[in-house]
A protein has these predicted regions:
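Transmembrane alpha-helices and immediately adjacent membrane-cytoplasm interface residues
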Residues: 51-86, 105-107, 230, 234-242
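Catalytic Zn2+-binding segment of zinc metalloproteases
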Residues: 161-180, 262-263
Length: 307
């Protein structure tokens, strides 16, 4: 399911990004500036794929290459290392390291995986949370360590291990990489709109030229309207699809913890978290990337009753 949602996300944002890039190239071309997108290697790619060499297909190839480059960069350990430093995340030390590693080793033993494949990190924050990161990292916040007992902490770690085993974090990281490219193209389009608006505010006071400026500005406003509609539709689709996929992954991770014999430990931990609030209301639940805690606790209890 995660891979399918990733493909859908890429297609949706890729299509909209290609349209926006096409508009950017077309608007710049109206000023007599030659396109820089029609490079020989892009034409060669299209010809090898048997696709027509047209402005829009050229933009599609560029967006695909931008996506691919961003995805590769996001996978590089140095990039992930920068994120850890930026968030003040580090490896545990001393007694804390012994405690966490013992908990983690027990969870991995239950799952039949090598604990050395993964690395534990600690973030010195009072927030009660933990999350999987990249391909092989789990970050535990100090607030969670202080709040949970050893049994409950193992339940949380089992849940996070599921995200790594099922590559949920890899899919999430890939989606983030594509969204970064998409947002960069949106920013480029808005900057172009700002430049055009500034130039228009000067030209509209010049006789004769002002008529052409008004016509051109009308076309630009129409294009901007189309882009905003496409942008809204893409975001609306993502807001529904991404949380849906995330909620499926959360339930699967809870079941994974149950299968390791840590379902009740996780349920106890989640029950504690309900004291700090839960997702209420249909709309909030629809767009939330986590199911309501009370539903997750109930599901874990149901699984325990089934044996």
């Amino acid at each position: 399911m995660g891979f399918l949602l990733l493909i859908i996300t890429g297609l949706i944002y890729g299509a909209v990004a290609s349209v926006i890039l096409f508009f950017i190239d077309w608007i710049i071309g109206l000023f007599g500036t030659p396109t820089i997108l029609e490079q020989p290697f892009i034409v060669d790619i299209l010809q090898r794929l048997g696709l027509p060499v047209e402005s829009f297909t050229i933009c599609c190839v560029w967006v695909a290459l931008f996506f691919l480059t961003s995805i590769i960069l996001f996978q590089l350990p140095p990039i992930q290392g920068l994120f850890l430093k930026f968030k003040n995340i580090s490896k545990p030390q001393g007694d804390l390291a012994v405690y966490l590693n013992n908990c983690w080793s027990d969870v991995c033993r239950r799952a039949g995986v090598d604990p050395d494949r993964y690395t534990l990190y600690v973030q010195h924050s009072k927030q009660i949370n933990a999350f999987a990161l990249g391909h092989n990292r789990v970050v535990v916040l100090m607030g969670l360590i202080d709040e949970m007992n050893e049994y409950e902490l193992k339940g949380i770690l089992a849940h996070e291990l599921s995200h790594l085993v099922h590559r949920d974090t890899t899919y999430g990281m890939t989606s983030a990489a594509m969204l970064n490219v998409y947002n960069a193209i949106i920013i480029a389009f808005e900057l172009l709109m700002l430049i055009i608006t500034t130039v228009y505010n000067v030209l509209r006071y010049i006789p004769f030229i002002n008529i052409l400026a008004v016509v051109f500005m009308a076309i630009v406003i129409f294009i901007r309207f189309i882009v905003r509609i496409l942008h809204s539709l893409a975001n609306f689709g993502y807001v529904l699809l991404a949380p849906f996929g995330s909620r499926i992954a959360e339930y699967r991770a809870d079941r994974f913890a149950h299968e390791l014999g840590l379902g009740q430990a996780l349920a106890s931990a989640l029950a504690k978290l309900t004291r700090y609030g839960d997702t209420e209301g249909f709309i909030n639940q629809l767009v939330s990337d986590h199911p309501p805690l009370r539903k997750r606790v109930a599901k874990l209890y149901e699984l325990s009753q089934q044996g």
